[in-house]
Amino acid sequence: MIIPTFHYDDAHAAIAFLEKGFGFERHAVYEGEDGIVAHAEIKAAGGWLMLGTSRPDSPYDIGKQSVYVVIDGDVDAHCERARAAGADVFREPTDQDYGGRDYSCRDPEGNTWSFGTYAPSDG
């Protein structure tokens, strides 16, 4: 299992955006004594995403992230939901030559997300 991990300047706002914009589901949120998100677990399209609050002294905060999420359902509707929640859609839903349909956007902190129906197979 591979679990992408993100660090956000405002992890509370990121969790709210991921729920509203992408339809992800909050599983657990652990806050530090200072009230910031130390660790959170989000259910995402049949998989998981972990996230926390960025810290200036952390070796993990090296820049923005990018991930492709395979979704079941209407890519165009997913794109519109994300856009309505504030995602910056920079590549509209497109049918790909290799199969599937997908789009790409940035969340409010600049991480790149692509959502689509293409899933690699072993066959």
What residues fall within each predicted segment?
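Vicinal oxygen chelate
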Residues: M1-T5, I15-P108, F115-G123
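Conserved beta-strand-loop-alpha-helix junction that forms the acyl-donor binding cleft
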Residues: Y8-D10
